[in-house]
Amino acid sequence: TDKTIPEANVYFIGFCVHRGSCSMEVSDFLSDLSGKQIALFGTCGMGDSPEYYKDIAGRVSAWIEADNDYLGYFICQGKMPQKVRMKYESMRTDENNDQIDRFIQNFDLALTHPDDLDVEHAKVFVDHMLKKIQL
């Protein structure tokens, strides 16, 4: 990022999932941190899958250097740009019709996310992280 980020002991790093990970800006920022406590949170358009979210968190947390204290992660479903739905529709063939239907159904369900329940879960995550933080 071009912006100066204030020095802190604890960082809550947010990101939107893109192709199963975070942006290069986020990964660069994470890899530059040293001696910090770090919690990750993000949104993911590709459905509500705890297993997939765990995989994403593993890929993103891999950028955190070993001298940091990785506190944990929270990922919830997030909405996607309309161009994603249009791409799905343009990819449809007789062979992948059912798969594209599932992608579009997920896209439509994601339009309301993050929702109130996601926000409540995020609050629980933050409370849990605050208990882990060593100031």
Where are these regions (language model features)?
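A short, well-structured beta->alpha microelement
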Residues: 1-4
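FMN-binding flavodoxin-like domain, especially the glycine-rich phosphate-binding loop
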Residues: 7-135
